[in-house]
């Protein structure tokens, strides 16, 4: 296994408050058991809350999206509470199968058998719908064990949004604002590539939905998100004098149907920016609002921030270096292009080791690397695997 360290110094991670038998996460103490695998370096990220910092790139993008939807249709924007959730909240209440790979210790950070660090914003979906919210946005830090490179990090930030209403009010609730939004998008000159068949066999309407109602929900979804694309990319994407282009692609997601991915043509290439769709009725039923219908979307804030600010490495978001942080500000919005600062030349280190059995997962090794070197390692590459003979 080859490691590519980043320039800098190793940093000690405090484990104050923890013991050999307990683990401390966000002020709560948990008894260690056979499921516990959340390391101190990950737990130390919890208080940072980058999405709540108004002058941080993640916080800037979150606030821009929240402000846009508040002006459009009065969406309520929320920040998720503690990332410590139960297995029931993160998996069971959302219909994850008992053998779903996302439940694996190789993918998820467990505090004990019953508690973990949320892996998606949807862990709070049932609670939000149950509170009666119909137009909402939720931003959160989420945690997943992952590989080591410039585009992956075990802590990242998601933003989820939904617009629902009672079934009998669907046509009147969605239709009027949709017509107004479609007209505004057309006036702005957005070029929309969307020749998908409505309710076609490859991306059908749900059996529980009247086709006319489903069609207006899809139109509402597309109008709102086309408007969001304009708000985020409109000025930057027209630097070359060409109109902004967006395209809609059929997709498959477990909680929506029909489902779509949205791509924007930005600086010479198509970029996927979010996934969305009409909410599955059984998902709303699990949340106790089966009498309602509507749409939802989800996006990664890091992905948008990396594109809009030209940030080349996802790990830079966690930097406390003033050379990084001073480049951004809430008052400047998107008027910032990241300027790289010097780093020492790369250094390669090769490591060889024997595995006692085949159950060892690559993510287990990545975790060891992060614990020892923090974010100093840029990349890990498996150079060769030698089978045991005899």
Report residues per predicted region.
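TRNA-recognition modules of translation machinery and tRNA-sensing kinases, especially anticodon-binding
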Residues: 3-385
């Amino acid at each position: 296994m080859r490691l590519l360290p980043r320039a800098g110094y190793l940093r000690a991670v405090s484990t104050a408050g923890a013991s050999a038998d307990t683990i401390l996460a966000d002020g709560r103490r948990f008894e260690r058991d056979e499921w516990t695998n959340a390391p101190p370096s990950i737990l130390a990220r919890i208080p940072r809350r980058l999405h709540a910092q108004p002058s941080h790139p993640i916080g800037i993008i979150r606030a821009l999206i929240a402000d846009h939807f508040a002006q459009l249709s009065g969406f309520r924007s929320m920040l998720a509470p503690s990332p410590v959730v139960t297995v029931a909240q993160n998996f069971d209440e959302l219909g994850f199968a008992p053998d779903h790979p996302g439940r694996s210790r190789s993918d998820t950070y467990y505090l004990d058998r019953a508690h973990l660090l949320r892996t998606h914003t949807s862990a709070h979906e049932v609670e939000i719908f149950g509170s009666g919210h119909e137009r909402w946005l939720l931003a959160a830090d989420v945690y997943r064990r992952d590989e080591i490179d410039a585009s992956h990090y075990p802590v990242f930030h998601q933003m989820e949004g939904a617009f629902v209403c009672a079934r009998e009010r669907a046509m009147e609730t969605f239709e009027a604002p949709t017509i107004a939004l479609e007209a505004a998008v057309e006036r702005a000159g957005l070029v929309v590539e969307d020749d998908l068949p409505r309710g076609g066999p490859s991306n059908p309407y749900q059996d529980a939905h009247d086709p006319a109602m489903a069609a207006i929900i899809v139109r509402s979804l597309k109008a709102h998100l086309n408007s969001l694309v304009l708000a985020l990319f409109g000025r930057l994407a027209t630097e070359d004098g060409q109109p902004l282009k967006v395209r809609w692609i059929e997709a498959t997601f477990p909680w929506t149907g029909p489902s779509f991915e949205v791509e924007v043509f930005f600086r010479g290439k198509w970029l996927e920016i979010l996934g969305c769709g009409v909410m599955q009725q059984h998902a709303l039923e699990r949340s106790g609002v089966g009498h309602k219908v509507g749409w939802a979307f989800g996006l990664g804030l890091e992905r948008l921030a990396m594109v809009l600010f030209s940030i080349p490495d996802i790990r830079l978001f966690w930097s406390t270096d003033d050379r990084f942080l001073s480049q951004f500000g809430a008052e400047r919005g998107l008027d910032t292009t990241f300027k790289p600062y010097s780093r020492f030349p790369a250094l390669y280190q090769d490591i060889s080791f024997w595995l006692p059995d085949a159950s060892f997962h690559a993510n287990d090794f990545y975790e060891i690397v992060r614990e020892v070197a923090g974010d100093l390692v840029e990349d890990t590459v498996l150079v060769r695997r030698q089978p045991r003979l005899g």
